[in-house]
Amino acid sequence: MLTGTVKGKQRQQVLSGLADGSINILVGTHAIIEDQVLFQHLGLAVIDEQHRFGVAQRAALWAKSERPPHILVMTATPIPRTLAMTLYGDLDVSVIDELPPGRKPVLTLHKYDNQMASLYAGITQQVNEGRQVYIVFPLIEENKKMDLKNLEEGYEQLCRIFPQFKLSKVHGQMKPKEKEAEMEKFVTGKTQILVATTVIEVGVNVPNASVMVILDAQRFGLSQLHQLRGRVGRGARQSYCILVTGYQLSEDTKKRIDIMCDTNDGFRIAEADLKLRGPGDLEGTQQSGMAFDL
C-alpha cells in the first residue's frame, strides 16, 4: 500500500518492490502518481472514484509503463468529459444499476434556510430511534468573501441545539490521527452526529447512518451531491438526504436540486450534468464546459 503517510524505509521498500517487479499488486492514493513511483511493468490500472482525478493525473499513471496498461475506471457519477467519451466510442461501459439486496432508495428532500426547526426535529427523531446523522458544511471557517455556513461555528451551534447527543467533527485541516479518531467515534456509534466537510465524500461506510444533511447545497456540483448522498442508504432502514439552500437560486442550481430530488440514478444525474456544464475537451484536460478551437 502506498499513501502520503507512508514514509522513510517503508516507502523505499514499496518503491523498490515496484521497480523490480516483486510487488504484484499496489493499492494507493494520489501518491502513486508521484514521479519517483516506477513500475517494472504496469499491466492494469484501476481507478475508483474517477471524478476525484484530473485528466493529467490519470495520464501520468498511464505513462508509468512502456506499454499502455489496461484501464478500468469506476464512478457513481461519470463527469461530463467521461460521459462524452463513452458516447463517442472511446470507452466501453459496464453499468451496475441495482442496489445491493435489502437496501432502499434514499429519499432526497429540498429545504430552505427558514425550515431548520423542522429539520432539527427530524434529526432528533432519527437519533432517538437509534440512527446516526451526517451534517455537511461547505467551509471549515468563516470566509468574508462568501456568505456561507462554516463548520467551526456550525459545530458549536449544533452542540447547543443537540445537548442530549454526542457529536464528532472532521475536516481536511485536521491532523490524520485526530481525524481518524473522530471518524472512529462515529463508526463505532460513540457519537450520533458527524459534522463534516466533503472529506467524507468517499470511503465512509456506516450502515446505521440514515440522514445526510447538506448545508448551502447550491455550492456543490451534482457529482459531489450524489457522492455525499451515497454515504447513507447503506443499511436496511429508509434513509434521507436533505439539501438545504436559501431562496435565491439560479436556474442551473434549481435544475441541479430538482434532478437530485427526482432520481438516485447516477447515469441520469451524469446526463443532466453533461447538459448543464458541457462535455469538456476530449483532446485536452478540460473535464466540463465547452471547448473551442480558435
Predicted regions and their residues:
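C-terminal accessory region of SF2 helicases/translocases
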Residues: 236, 240, 248-294
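Inter-lobe coupling/hinge segments of SF2-like helicase ATPases
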Residues: 1-258, 268
